[in-house]
Amino acid sequence: RDFLVVGNIVGSTNRIQWSGINDITVWSGKQSDFQDLPGSGGRVVAITSGEVGYVFRQNQIVRMDYVGGATVFRLSVISPNRGAVFGKTVCQDNRRVFFYADDGFYEIQGDNVVGIGVEKVNRFFDADLNKAYADRIVAATDPFNTLAMWLYPSVNNTNNTTGICDRMIIYNYATQKWSLAKTNASQIFPQFVGAYTVELMDIISENLEDINAALDTDYWDGGQ
């Protein structure tokens, strides 16, 4: 979390590189370094953040643990044959990391990659996804409602010639239940708003009678 980590460097698609500690302007010294990931895992497509980082390659997942010293980061392969084909299929809520691989939906729990869409969900999604536009899949989490979501183009949209996503499959990681929604979008992402003060109420309306939400509700608390 104290480094900027990048991957898929021009000319070295399997390379990760990190900045100096607490200084993203430094790329030489201050514990900055790089590492070429060995094996046939493919190019780096996503890197998660936090106290523990996960580097997603197309067919491999590598865990990054900060140890300092000459080593800086300890790199451990936790998934030697499964990764994320597309980087945008990865999303996280703090240390909970979710992703879609070419054989289904998964969550990383420590050093374990656990299937969350085994059987029915994975079969449904594989049949419903318009694979000609699979690169349009976009994932995001809603931490307040404990949801991991994947926006995708379905085969049922017969008029879709541009790959616009028309469905969203949703996993509630508190209840471990799935749901499906119709939509028409190309992006989803988490966004948190600040709280409203009395001074900011004019942004909503100059007349309190025109405001639909009661002033004593959590609508105005922010963070949603």
Residue ranges and their predicted role:
Residues R1-V26, K30, S40:
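Carboxylate/His-rich catalytic cores and anion/metal-binding grooves
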Residues F3, G39-Q224:
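Beta-sheet-dominated scaffold domains
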Residues Q35-L37:
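Hydrophobic alpha-helical transmembrane segments corresponding to the first two to three helices
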